[in-house]
Amino acid sequence: RKPYPSIIIGVRKGGTRALLEMLSLHPDVAAAENEVHFFDWEEHYSQGLGWYLGQMPFSSPHQLTVEKTPAYFTSPKVPERVHSMNPGIRLLLILRDPSERVLSDYTQVFYNHVQKRKPYPSIEEFLVRDGRLNVGYKALNRSLYHVHLQNWLRFFPLHRIHIVDGDRLIRDPFPEIQKVERFLKLSPQINASNFYFNKTKGFYCLRDGGRDRCLHESKGRAHPQVDPRLLNKLHEYFHEPNKKFFELVGRTFDWH
């Protein structure tokens, strides 16, 4: 059968792939392989819910289906569309330090260009215009979490959106995954022994029934060297937006 899924709605470069892989350790989770882009791409949305459910893996009656498309979080039309499919849906949102997320966002696009042997400007060229922070840079906008979350809160109460601390998930995955299990009403099946620290890679990998697997080598890539003064500008820029976000969700995060 193919029931409505729970959705990891974002954020891009927040740790959505890691979260989905970790959740997949649970026997009662059936995870969609690819980012479906149903609610944000018109050519998919126009094909209707039947098409969407067709992209989901088959699941048994006791299983929960999960899909992730990080672009959903920052796409203004998506919350209403998700709500019209299933107002009672449980949503997962994984966030990390907004400045770090911007650097990671740049790094991904930079490496995509490198692989295609295409030139790509330095991060400074995106972040600075006329000696000031370039607030028109899309990656900055994606890190204004309070702006995008407000859009979702017009359609869903906060208790329907579980916010995963992406920085903690990478440092110490098990406690964060336990919270996700509880939120999704899954039985506690994932254990601390499912995670082991890989010294070579510098982050946690997964152990699943004797099978070890690490996230794709694109994960944990080094960010570009950024001038400390520019980093400070980034931190200053996000200071107020972060405060607004903390007020919105009633909790704080250990961000710059």
Describe the predicted segments one by one.
Residues 1-73, 85, 89, 99-129:
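PAPS-dependent sulfotransferase catalytic core
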Residues 10-12, 22-23, 180-184, 244-246:
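Marks the mature luminal ectodomains of secretory-pathway proteins
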Residues 15-16, 52, 66, 82, ...:
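Generic structural signal for small/hydrophobic residues in well-ordered secondary structure
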Residues 37-39, 69-73, 138-139, 166-170, ...:
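Short histidine/acidic/glycine/proline-rich micro-motifs that form metal-
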Residues 46-49, 75-76, 146, 228:
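Structural motif corresponding to alpha-helix initiation and N-cap regions
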Residues 49-53, 79, 149-150, 242:
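Generic structural signal for well-ordered alpha-helices
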Residues 77-80, 84, 88-93, 100-184, ...:
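PAPS-dependent sulfotransferase catalytic domain
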Residues 150-243, 250-256:
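The conserved 3'-phosphoadenosine-5'-phosphosulfate
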